[in-house]
Amino acid sequence: MNPLTLVRETTAWVSGLSKHVKINNEALDKECEDFLNKHKIKAHKEIWADNWFHYCDIDIENKESTFTELTAKYILVLDTLNFCFWPDSEFEYHHLARGLKNALIANPKCFDADQLIKVTSETIHQWFGKDLPNTSERVRLIREVGTVLIEYFNGSIKEMILSANNKASVLVDLVTKYFWGFRDSAIYKGKQVFFYKRAQIFVGDLWGAYQGRGLGKFDDIKQLTMFADYRVPQILEELKVIEYSPELKEMIKNKVEIPVGSEMELEIRAVTVHVVEKMRDYFNKGHCELLALEIDWMLWGRGEAMLDKLPPHHRTLTIFY
């Protein structure tokens, strides 16, 4: 079955049963209408390639350049490590992206598969000038990426991407099939629920960096959902689009850890996915066609810009986001 359909359908199911997280449809409609009044057209390229902390060596006017794999290697490592920074209050996504960018500039071969299998905690420290939360898991996941690329794709990320035949759904399926660390699913009320956050964001980042060409060309990019993390629900709650139960709201306010796989955690993530689906449908009806991933990036960027003013986000120790 299409993995992106699984994400969309199972998260909608959880949203319909959710006890701790509800959608405020009136606030949702207001946010969408306000957006439509301000932005009739939104280009995706400004959101990814124009971020100074990202590495991107693509010359979009040069067809050969859109098939070079250095940026793709960077993106795979980036999204392998793109999870759970909150235990370190002084480390955010842009620190991760910039640290990897600097490492790649210093040594363009550092993200080759035969180098990834040798990564240690000392390597991580060298890349960022400090230890990251859960370093041992990050090392394991990076080594897994190198091992899989060597065993199944001749050490070539380009070969892996091209084997998907320009299908985002196929590439997400490949990533979750071969890289166990990307298998982001859980059990809710006895039923498996799928998110595939880091697998999807890997495809979305390729599309953004390569601007939908070469290694970033995906004919079904519209099928990607948003990437369920902790920043987007944080901004949605601030905008009153989602509402937490008193118990959950108090836990988040007091920075109490929400157990991974708990009903509360899964409802936060699933309802967030479903909200973005509803926003996308609203925009499309308003003749402003946006992808779920574009809405995700805009909400995430809005949350990052308001970081000092936002209430706490939920805290869950996980390797998935």
UniProtKB/Swiss-Prot annotation:
InterPro entries the UniProt entry points to: Q_salvage
Reaction(s) catalysed (UniProt annotation): queuosine 5'-phosphate + H2O = queuine + D-ribose 5-phosphate
Chain positions recorded as queuine binding sites: 227, 229, 296
Hydrolase as UniProt keyword: yes
Catalytic-site annotation from UniProt: 229 (nucleophile or transition state stabilizer)
Keywords: Hydrolase
UniProt record, GO biological process: nucleoside salvage; tRNA-guanine transglycosylation
Record's function text: Catalyzes the hydrolysis of queuosine 5'-phosphate, releasing the nucleobase queuine (q). Is required for salvage of queuine from exogenous queuosine (Q) that is imported and then converted to queuosine 5'-phosphate intracellularly.
More details: Eukaryotes lack the canonical genes for de novo biosynthesis of queuosine (Q), present in most bacteria. Therefore, this molecule must be sourced from ingested food and/or the gut microbiota, and metabolized to its corresponding nucleobase, queuine (q), before incorporation into cytoplasmic and mitochondrial tRNAs. Incorporation of q into the anticodon of some tRNAs contributes to translational efficiency and accuracy.
Family: Belongs to the QNG1 protein family.
The protein's name in its UniProt record: Queuosine 5'-phosphate N-glycosylase/hydrolase
Species assigned in the record: Dictyostelium discoideum
